[in-house]
Structure formats: structure tokens, C-alpha cells
Amino acid sequence: MDNYGETVARHKLILAAEAAQVHAQWFAEHGHLYHESMVELILRGREVSVGELAEALNGRQQLRRELTTLMDENGLDLWICPSAPGAAPRGLESTGDPIMNLPWTHSGMPTVNLPAGLDGAGLPMGLQAVGRWYEDEALLEWSAQLEVTLAQGG
């Protein structure tokens, strides 16, 4: 896998550029109604050149190829990793840290998050299963089996 910092930067660039494209008309007409963080994202996205976006999209495809090659070379059907670096946050102010999901989301690989118990404070913990690109149905089959195993404490 390439440098994680590069993956994060690429992901943010693509996210901003696509947000600017998708919201172009509505933002022009109703920009004053947008949340400040969305305004910042759209304005950043407007600054992304076609060349920068193309390079980021190519990097995303390269990451997907690298992950697929790793799976092929090691006979992996899926990856299993934590959903987040810790338990879910208390309250609704935050959805938590996306660090554990970002590489998979960026590469376009399907993910399923599974309940994996509670921490000492009673907050939920999770695992995510990551499947091969365009093999969502196989991931769902694996995830159903994993869910049963996790529920049994295994």
C-alpha cells in the first residue's frame, strides 16, 4: 500500500473536486444556505485542476490494483480490521475517526462494519470486513458468517 498520507491527500482532493462539481448549480443559487464546512470543501474543490484530479484518480486506481495484488498473492478473500481506532464516540457530536475506513473507501473496495462487543464504558466496538473490488455479494456472504461468529463470542 502506498504512503497513507498520500492516500489521505488524494482522497480529500477527489472529495473536494467532486463536491464542487455535484453542487455547482445549487451552490451558485443557494450557497448562503450551506454549512460552513461544506462551503470550504466546495471552494477547495473549485481550485482543483483537471490534471490534479486525473492524477488523484489514477493514484486511486493504482492503490486498488496494489490491494488486489496483495489479496491474490496471499490467497485472501477479505481483509478484517478494526472499524475505528477505538470505541464509538459518546453522543452525536462526532461520527468518530475515519482513519481505518479511508483506504478502503478511497480504493472503492466494499466494506461491511460488524458489531464486535462493547468497551469498558459500554460503548460499541466494531470490525470491518473488506472485500474485493466489485465482489460486494461475496463480502456480504462472508459478513453474514462473521456476524454469527462474533455474536457467539468467537
Regions inferred by a protein language model and the residue ranges of each:
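Small-aliphatic-rich amphipathic alpha-helix that forms the alpha element of a beta-alpha
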Residues: 66-69, 92-115
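Short, surface-exposed loop/helix-turn segments at secondary-structure junctions
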Residues: 11, 55, 73-74, 83-102
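Generic non-transmembrane alpha-helical segments
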Residues: 66-73, 99, 145-153
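Structural helix-boundary/capping segments
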Residues: 48, 54, 106-154
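Gly/Ser-rich, acidic/histidine-flanked active-site/gating loops
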Residues: 1-11
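Short helix-loop capping/hinge segments that flank enzyme active sites or metal/cofactor-binding pockets
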Residues: 13-64, 68, 113-126
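Conserved acidic residues
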Residues: 77
